[in-house]
Amino acid sequence: MADDKNVYEIGLAMAGAISAGAYSAGVVDFLFQALHEWELAKRDEPDTVPNHSVCIRAAAGASAGSITAALAAVAVAGGLRPQKAANPEVGEQPYQCVLPALYKAWVTLPDMASAATDPKDLLANDDLKDGASPQSILNAAILTALTGEALGLPDLPNGAETPPAFGGAPLPYLAKRLHIYLTLSNMRGVPYFVGFEGGGEIRGHHMMCHGDRAHYILEGVGTHGGENTWLSGDSGQSLKITTAPRAGKPSDKAWEGYGHTALASAAFPVGLAARSIETDVGQYETRKWPRLSETAKSYPPRWPEKLKESKKFAFMSLDGGLIDNEPFEYARRAIMRDGEKDETGESTVKGAVVMIDPFPEPPAFSLKEVQEASIFDVVRALFPMLKNQARFKPDALATAFDNSNYSRWMISPSRTVAGTHGEKNERYAIATGVLGGFGGFLDESFRAHDYQLGRRNCQKFLRDVFSVGEDHPYVRDWPPGVADKFHNYDKEAKKFYHPVIPLVGTAALPVPAPQWPRIDQSRLAEIERRIRLRATYVVPRLIASKNRHKLLSVAAGRAWSWYGKDKLLKVVHRTIESDLIRRDQLDSEKSFSVEAREVLAELNAPGYDYRTVAGLDEVLYLNKTQVEKALEELEQIPNLLWSGEVNSQKCWALKVRVPGWLERHDPFRGEPRIG
């Protein structure tokens, strides 16, 4: 057996993803299946598999990543409970999931428009008491019930081994103290002070930190000790895993707070309700900052005297991903070893950060060189500018250009399909990416697809990517002949590489590619009906709660009923439908090329009356030739497109979208919108 020196440490980092958390959950689900199967093989056939150990020491999450990290840690401590896949082929992966609580939390429950007679979903209207002001567009109350249900561990099946949450043996692939970091966007802020010498009354610089986090330590989950000084000295709340909630039984306040904090990290602004957090000022006094330097200092805040006396600190939290959406620095700091050089080479590395990111795409970068900006241009750019700057991490640039760094790995969506020259990667890999991540709540099939894609991508990552060099000490200590069984040959480097986590048992059976999901027009119509009901319920209450003048309130209500509601719902319809068309997630009798779908989606989208080739070229990743060919393809469909000259420009539009004669000659309408 490998000794304590042959332990490879892992820090998981899970990026924010809204409904695409289903993908991250699938990745984590398969990761624990692979670790479990490997441990069984080490126990039963020790001479046939790699004998080093892996220790997951920390999991850091933002937004949806926080929910996945928090729920998965408890679920795995309650024991793997494999669920059979529907009609698996011979030789294929037999399981749909091994952590059903995670599957239920991300796939089954969080729907926008449930088919149930008495729906409890994100568009239900039971979250507002009479006269109360709406806290969010969607009904976030369902998420509270969902998290509570997912955290509650069901009784053990007959004959199952006793897991750590039920007093059984700790897991050999987790740390004794599993650290969970959840990022928060603190609406109140935490005050800090930097002293300067000078002659003024205030000798220093005051700052307010809104990028907050919660730190939980789950005790008794795994077997591995040896955490570093930074981690052991960082303030946090300890929870014994044997006190984890049980299904159908009330949980204590500490565990309720654990689930509530995970939800607070995922409180997407406006869409989902902000969450209240109450903690102790002492949590900030010994807090460590996750910088890469070896310094383990704390920087206490400059609290007002009143707060120092009360010791309690309460604030409202928004989505942690607003400020820190990829919290890999916490995972990185957690696995650094005291007194040792941070080795990153293929044959010297002793641990790694594994980041799971469903949306790794870069922020939009404008190719336009503008010389002036209107007030509206400034307002439109302000939020993305502040968000991107808040997420910028200069410390990470220090190692950004080190291509030989084997201590940073990423799992992100990849979906291959058959092409004319072999397999090709689809532009849209995940089904929950509709509407920037909210669209996964439109239908369970979207989330189910991404959960399985996460499992499939994780399997490929462990098999083909996550590795060390052939001269690594762990590999040299493997039993005779094992390295010949578990390896990949890199033709370019002319080297063998060996897996950090080998695939054995059921984990070696391939996870099949899930079928790409689509919804039909009837399902879309039902979703839009529910959106109308939700809007009819929420908007008048929002108007009434923020308008103290009765006459203004009545006028605003009339404007909404007579004009605003239909206008808004038309925009919502076209926005949803366009994104579904673009991503090939709406059933259609016609099959279009990728380029034609992109153009068709833009023609259908709200915002313009008429489109030009130049305008389409500007907003799409296509060039002008591709746009023109796509328009030619669409023009082959009878009664689909209109084309003609408008204001001396060659324009296109969907025939059903072309303004009628009355609309075109409306004196209050203004110039047609062309782009």
Model-identified regions with their sequence ranges:
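Charged low-complexity interaction tracts in eukaryotic proteins
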Residues: E633-P672
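Patatin-like phospholipase
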Residues: M1-A596, D609
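Short helix-capping/hinge SLiMs at alpha-helix to coil transitions
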Residues: L603-Y608, E633
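Hydrophobic residues on short alpha-helical segments
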Residues: A596-N604, E628
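Short amphipathic alpha-helical interaction segments
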Residues: L622-E633
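Short acidic, hydrophobic short linear motifs in intrinsically disordered regions
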Residues: Y608-V619
